[in-house]
Amino acid sequence: MVPYHIRQYQDSDHKRVVDVFTKGMEEYIPSTFRHMLMLPRTLLLLLGVPLALVLVSGSWILAVICIFFLLLLLRLLARQPWKEYVAKCLQTDMVDITKSYLNVHGACFWVAESGGQVVGIVAAQPVKDPPLGRKQLQLFRLSVSSQHRGQGIAKALTRTVLQFARDQSYSDVVLETSALQQGAVTLYLGMGFKKAGQYFMSIFWRLAGICTIQLKYSFPSA
């Protein structure tokens, strides 16, 4: 196992942080495509439309072209929301990480470094409108480069956020993650997070059958 350490973000980390985050999010494009491909409505479309073309035109070539086009369209649909999400993040909080996190009271951004290179990231910001009587911290942007997974880095980064929250007297740490990110969900549940709810971020995600899961870690004294 290659050694690593966790430290606070520095401006010189920005390019590598963006790279880790972007690649981490775009890895979910293939799994989104596979999930959508196996939906009954998708299978019905892939079989029904080409078959209708064969019955109307008598051309199997046209049917094959239609299937290819539908698969290409499905791939583009699976790709677009992740690309838009990354673009939105890079134009908002991640355009200036120091301003968005390090200069905000009760917030922070950490990186995991190994061999002089950033291999993992995580961020946290206070929840703007928490429930009455609660002081909540939201965990964001957890991602570890594919070459450094399986070494406990994601768990260590999450522990860093939990310790920060404890030190800052937060009552809860909350986060949201896609149901597709089963590895992340398993990690959080194994660390004591509890499911607090779920919802669909948009009509697209509802049609795709992929919900956003809300998780919460409450400190015993809270």
UniProtKB/Swiss-Prot annotation:
One protein family per Pfam: Acetyltransf_1
InterPro entries for this protein: Acyl_CoA_acyltransferase (IPR016181), GNAT_dom (IPR000182), NAT_camello-type (IPR050769)
Keyword Transferase found: yes
GO BP annotations listed: gastrulation with mouth forming second; negative regulation of cell adhesion
UniProt keyword list: Acyltransferase, Developmental protein, Gastrulation, Membrane, Transferase, Transmembrane, Transmembrane helix
Alphabetical list of SUPFAM superfamilies matching this protein: Acyl-CoA N-acyltransferases (Nat) (SSF55729)
UniProt superkingdom: Eukaryota
Principal location: membrane
Family: Belongs to the camello family.
Free-text function comment from the UniProt entry: May play a role in regulation of gastrulation.
Name of the featured protein: N-acetyltransferase 8F1
Originating organism: Mus musculus (Mouse)
Gene behind the chain: Nat8f1
